[in-house]
Curated annotation (Swiss-Prot):
GO molecular function, one term: actin monomer binding
Superkingdom of origin organism: Eukaryota
Subunit record text: Occurs in many kinds of cells as a complex with monomeric actin in a 1:1 ratio.
Name this polypeptide is given: Profilin-3
Origin species: Phleum pratense (Common timothy)
Other notes: The variability of the residues taking part of IgE-binding epitopes might be responsible of the difference in cross-reactivity among olive pollen cultivars, and between distantly related pollen species, leading to a variable range of allergy reactions among atopic patients.
Xref: SUPFAM superfamilies: Profilin (actin-binding protein) (SSF55770)
UniProt KW keywords: Actin-binding, Allergen, Cytoplasm, Cytoskeleton, Disulfide bond, Phosphoprotein
Gene: PRO3
Length: 131
């Protein structure tokens, strides 16, 4: 299965009539493996900040997390594994696997829990596959 198929079929899938606004899978170095058509352009320093927060949980909390120049308030995640962010009526979930970052961005009416479920389910599967 291609990385694009994971994005199209597993991240951009419909959940209770809703779907993510955009999604992507990155390498730990920030290389885009696959993304939805309207996924925002990450800056290299944003990926660096995300990886640092995954290595040193709490790094982004004081300043917020920037994604494509949009600021997200960092909310509780799983130290070293998941970062969650909130911005207005939407937010972001980032799941770290052995080799990748699985990213989902949502807006209302999708809920934070639905975004978390979609992103973390694929991330957990990739971890089980050694990815």
């Amino acid at each position: 299965m291609s990385w694009q198929t994971y994005v199209d079929e597993h991240l951009m899938c419909e959940i209770e009539g809703h779907h993510l606004a955009s999604a992507a899978i990155f390498g730990h170095d920030g290389t885009v493996w696959a993304q939805s058509a309207d996924f925002p352009q990450f800056k290299p320093e944003e990926i660096t900040g995300i990886m640092k927060d995954l290595d040193e949980p709490g790094h982004l909390a004081p300043t917020g997390m920037f994604v494509a120049a949009a600021k997200y308030m960092v909310i509780q995640g799983e130290p070293g594994a998941v970062i969650r962010g909130k911005k207005g009526a939407g937010g972001i979930t980032i799941k770290k696997t052995g080799q990748a970052l699985v990213v989902g961005i949502y807006d209302e009416p999708m809920t934070p829990g639905q975004c978390n479920m979609v992103v973390e389910r694929l991330g957990d599967y990739l971890v089980e596959q050694g990815m």
